Amino acid sequence: MVLSSSCTTVPHLSSLAVVQLGPWSSRIKKKTDAVAVPAAAGRWRARARAQDTSESAAVAKGSSLTPIVRTDAESRRTRWPTDDDDAEPLVDEIRAMLTSMSDGDISVSAYDTAWVGLVPRLDGGEGPQFPAAVRWIRNNQLPDGSWGDAALFSAYDRLINTLACVVTLTRWSLEPEMRGRGLSFLGRNMWKLATEDEESMPIGFELAFPSLIELAKSLGVHDFPYDHQALQAIYSSREIKVKRIPKEVMHTVPTSILHSLEGMPGLDWARLLKLQSSDGSFLFSPAATAYALMNTGDDRCFSYIDRTVKKFNGGVPNVYPVDLFEHIWAVDRLERLGISRYFQKEIEQCMDYVNRHWTEDGICWARNSDVKEVDDTAMAFRLLRLHGYSVSPDVFKNFEKDGEFFAFVGQSNQAVTGMYNLNRASQISFPGEDVLHRAGPFSYEFLRRKQAEGALRDKWIISKDLPGEVVYTLDFPWYGNLPRVEARDYLEQYGGGDDVWIGKTLYRMPLVNNDVYLELARMDFNHCQALHQLEWQGLKKWYTENRLMDFGVAQEDALRAYFLAAASVYEPCRAAERLAWARAAILANAVSTHLRNSPSFRERLEHSLRCRPSEETDGSWFNSSSGSDAVLVKAVLRLTDSLAREAQPIHGGDPEDIHKLLRSAWAEWVREKADAADSVCNGSSAVEQEGSRMVHDKQTCLLLARMIEISAGRAAGEAASEDGDRRIIQLTGSICDSLKQKMLVSQDPEKNEEMMSHVDDELKLRIREFVQYLLRLGEKKTGSSETRQTFLSIVKSCYYAAHCPPHVVDRHISRVIFEPVSAAK
């Protein structure tokens, strides 16, 4: 089961100036606007403002009640959001990216290319075996004399790339001027090693850089600062690391050390060749494999290098392939940016690919690896489980030792991103999955400790706002994460093409981090937001016309109710579901209050709900009364009538049947609310009331689910066909009741910590069971995934509301509903 919307219409978006200069990695976009607000979105915002200013006048004139969605005529005029071609090129381009995935699109590493260029002809002749690699070096020196990532300066990266290229050119007595400029750069910048952040040190730098220095010295490279003070710390680190390398182990079983063999002395190649990866590489490292080829002449090493050189037109990346890494991380980015609905087929293909290469021991960045690591394993586990694949959490036992979790099998260190993705994986645990129940607290405490230390940096990536990503996930776990809140934050955390990964050198993954995803996501968000603003204007009119302020529902309550709906069901094509949720939630709050205050109200409302749509106006009371009972009864009946009219074209059949579904849902809710021992609101403080209006009880949550489902053309809860479906409905109600109870307990100073802990434990168990039923039914492909998504959205919104302080909710409302996303990166 894919827990995402099937709504895939392409939005009407503003034009984007794009220049295509070759492959994805060289895509350049022209940015001219300060704020990425589509022209159409701007028009809708202007219209929303105009509607807002004329609202009171319209009400004064006795205008007809606001419809649940726009009329057919209005929809034809606006054609929201399907008929503009501006988004099509972006969607098509991303689709082409996703379908082009193979072994991974990755930038070239000058360091690794230099090692490949050092391989002499294997037939004993003079010159390099791979002259194309040497050509690449000659063609890619930067203006300052260095080699490396041109857009981001890192002393580690530039120094190791530059020294490697100088060594290779010296080995073949080529380009003395280039070598001189490279050596000049090294001399000018060596001091910067002492100022670099250790977290950004490339993989194996303390081993590889001294090895290159020794190689340079053996080749007679002059003018290199061999005794520079900044090198002393690197030499010391090398001695410590060399002593720690388990030489016997590294020759016996595959370990991550295989990735960094180049320049390492005292290797037993006969034994190491038995540890080659299936593609002939040494843990997918061109540099390590080139070094092995120099020392062994192995045919499989040659084949791997030869294929890679040809693939990248002379250069080679720092690691290859990166197929699993690319497939997994691209899906994650698209989902968090809120644009995955456009690419459901392509995402399904990506996840099928990952599932084919999943193993019970885990995975790493490339298929068929004998070495596994927790970062890719955790990301793949989470996505596979969420997309309906059966995966066992026992895989994480491979990364656990003495109650701690680590990055690679056999190691004992952690990285921020590895623990971050482990924590995300633990959030979708099932009952009894003890390893995930241990991984969750361990990773949470590790990350919170790093946060307190101001150390949420990672050795694998230099991203725009990794601390923001981590803190958001810790504050809003998966079962309390509203999609549009996440997308709004991630749009400011995702750096697009500016995000850089750290391997042996800096590298880029253009199908994971690129500006095309970012541009479409910004446009989509702003476009949906403009529609949401227009809907809110209509909802305010409806709120005023029905006098809901007279029943204790403030306009702020109405806005919060709409926000929960819009942040959960945000797609333009799901306006009917979104507005049904919001209006039902607002009206339910008003009715709940009036049921307690008016003894006669229940009987009158139930009587009216039992009548046929044409009968309720026959009674003299209904026609003549303008009291509070009549006002609220009319509001409920008008809502059910509006929902029925909008849902009839979707359902088909007899409109009377839809009315019956809607009215019976409300009648059942009224009966249960009136009969329940409702101690929640009695004696509540103002603060408690504010929260209680957002956190619904079981009866109201199930009412909202039925309103959403009927508006979507389904009828959740009327006749659940599977035991699992029925259990999901039961658990939804139970979780919502527990959340309501938790909120009230937390606000009562007389309640003790033991009671709060008991409520938390019960809630945790119910959520795990809910997640299990939800995702296991997805694995079986039974029932309606859309209906399960409805219940998930209801649970998430209640969890969010119960745990999120009011001032944070209000900030999210502002960002999600009212503040457009800026184009500034």
Swiss-Prot record:
Keyword tRNA processing: no
One annotated Gene Ontology cellular component of this protein: chloroplast
Induction cue: Induced by the fungal pathogens Fusarium graminearum and Fusarium verticillioides.
Sequence motif DXDD motif, location on chain: 373-376
InterPro entries: Isoprenoid_synthase_dom_sf, Terpene_synth_N, Terpene_synth_N_sf, Terpene_synthase-like, Terpenoid_cyclase/PrenylTrfase
Keyword check for Isomerase: yes
Pfam families listed in its UniProt record: Terpene_synth
Cofactor(s) required for function per UniProt: Mg(2+)
Superkingdom in the source lineage: Eukaryota
E.C. no: 5.5.1.13
Gene3D superfamilies recorded: 1.50.10.160, Farnesyl Diphosphate Synthase, Terpene synthase, N-terminal domain
Protein family: Belongs to the terpene synthase family. Tpsc subfamily.
The protein's name in its UniProt record: Ent-copalyl diphosphate synthase 2, chloroplastic
Organism expressing this protein natively: Zea mays (Maize)
Lineage: Eukaryota, Viridiplantae, Streptophyta, Embryophyta, Tracheophyta
